[in-house]
Amino acid sequence: MEIGLREWLIVIGIIVIAGILFDGWRRMRGGKGKLKFRLDRSLSNLPDEDTSAELLGPARVLDTHKEPQLDEHDLPSVSMPAREAREPRESGSKRGKRGGNGPAQGDLNLDLDLDGGPSFSSRDDDFVEPAAKSSPAVADKDQPQAEEVLVISVICRDPAGFKGPALLQNILESGLRFGEMDIFHRHESMAGNGEVLFSMANAVKPGIFDLDDIDHFSTPAVSFFLGLPGPRHPKQAFDVMVAAARKLSQELNGELKDDQRSVLTAQTIEHYRQRIVEFERRALTQKR
């Protein structure tokens, strides 16, 4: 039986396919050997455990930033029993302190004129503003009288004024605590400990807050004020006061005003800071 051209082509094709398969199988085996060889070389170059420990060094602990939080222990008690317990102790001292002379931090005469701003009352005498005038003193005898006062007022845009519960919650979050003269003070500690940095008074005479009736309380405006001399670090205390006033203004729909009843601007804030610097310079000069 003779083999034709077709049969030869089939045989040749089979041989070619077999050759291709064999070559591929050979390459695969060769590739596996090379891969294993490269892996072995890589592993042989790795440092031992002692060297690795020296290179890596000790583990580092990363500090994560956490916002300050207030717990129940930070908040002042506004319950009736606490109020009643405080009143007998303070009643006598208030009468004695209100007979003193010269203003001090946390106790300054109030005389806020809201002309040019929202009209809250037909009587200008109903409104008060911290000012360095003669007034009773509530601070200790060792505390110097305030020679200069930096004032930031927050006036409510709502004709109904700031509601007591919302106002109380806002200023407590800023670290202010109810204290002397029935107004709020910001101390060094958020818990109400340490020296007074600045204070906040009601803009309506007599300038106080009644925590017993806070649920029904409202006011058209409040005033933050910082007396000089006052805190040991007045510039830092002023920045904290600005932050508290801004927070109140932003969250309760208020408008910031300076001591001239003008809109509080970045330029005004910088001017306040310059007043602090100038006061500190004069104080250093007097000590010399």
UniProtKB/Swiss-Prot annotation:
Keywords: Cell cycle, Cell division, Cell inner membrane, Cell membrane, Membrane, Transmembrane, Transmembrane helix. Residues 66-141 are annotated as: Disordered. Residues 23-288 are cytoplasmic. PANTHER family: CELL DIVISION PROTEIN ZIPA. The keyword Cell membrane applies. The keyword Kinase does not apply. Its main location: membrane. Belongs to the ZipA family. It comes from the Bacteria. InterPro entries: Cell_div_ZipA, ZipA_FtsZ-bd_C, ZipA_FtsZ-bd_C_sf. It comes from Pseudomonas fluorescens (strain Pf0-1). Residues 1 are periplasmic. Interacts with FtsZ via their C-terminal domains. It is found in: Cell inner membrane. Pfam families: ZipA_C. The chain crosses the membrane at residues 2-22. Residues 66-75, 83-93 have a biased composition (Basic and acidic residues). HAMAP family: ZipA. GO terms for cellular component: cell division site; plasma membrane. It is a single-pass type I membrane protein. Essential cell division protein that stabilizes the FtsZ protofilaments by cross-linking them and that serves as a cytoplasmic membrane anchor for the Z ring. Also required for the recruitment to the septal ring of downstream cell division proteins. Residues 106-117 have a biased composition (Low complexity). The gene is zipA. This is Cell division protein ZipA.
